[in-house]
């Protein structure tokens, strides 16, 4: 690493998960390279209890913002002008103790890289979700394994929002931000942001960056709104040019098929009927020329 280690900030946008957020902050204790600071932007004041914060090695700062993942993440960006790298994590992502140290090494060694991400070995977002205890055990098992050789980088289309780090010099030089026309949970906001940043460097994934994503279901938005966003947001991104037509149409088709084929046999943790209804409403709006990500605010 360089003589002056990179200053890395951690940003967490959160909504309706006060207890889970507290557990996640506790998991940031003991990083082999402590964060320069941790910024938490809650959707509502009561979503973040800052009365008794753990010692993560740097200050934990409350950031205020209007509700909405993109707006909250942009508010965090505005507070990290003194840092080199910003790592966004979900409020239910537990990074391994060496995560920040490895991340700093990657950004120093690869000056052409602008976004680094990883796809967790254990990701509750793809199923019913993982428990806190499961995540702790997975981290323990990982720590007991021999340290692997540094994994190579692999170029990828976009960063994964649950752990997405960005080189801040690129962000500020080109005035890059999350698109606040994607309201509330900002479906596919990580793809949109990544493709905008990708114009200025490489977007890579590195599996040696280990963490566990619980995929907590508490605090999720309605199925109807999500279903609408599954159509409206890719259409919006394709039209503005941040998402390829091939990628966007594949996203829409995949979600339509999933929601329809599982309509009568849905997973207990997924509102397939609500999502299918939202898909249908968005397709109707697309047909009459009024489809827009912001329409979910009316549903």
Predicted regions: what is each one?
Residues 12, 16-30:
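Short, well-formed alpha-helical segments that are part of the catalytic scaffolds
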Residues 98-132:
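Conserved donor NDP-sugar-binding/catalytic core segment of glycosyltransferases
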Residues 70-85:
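Active-site nucleotide-sugar/metal-binding loop of Leloir-type enzymes
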Residues 181, 185, 202, 206-224, ...:
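Active-site donor/metal-binding and catalytic loop motifs
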Residues 135-157:
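Short, flexible, basic/aromatic active-site loop/helix in glycosyltransferases
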Residues 25-63:
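Acidic donor-binding segment of Leloir-type glycosyltransferases
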Residues 225-233, 244-299:
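Non-catalytic, C-terminal membrane-associated alpha-helical segments of glycosyltransferases
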Residues 158-166, 170-176, 180-209:
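A short, conserved alpha-helix in the catalytic core of glycosyltransferases
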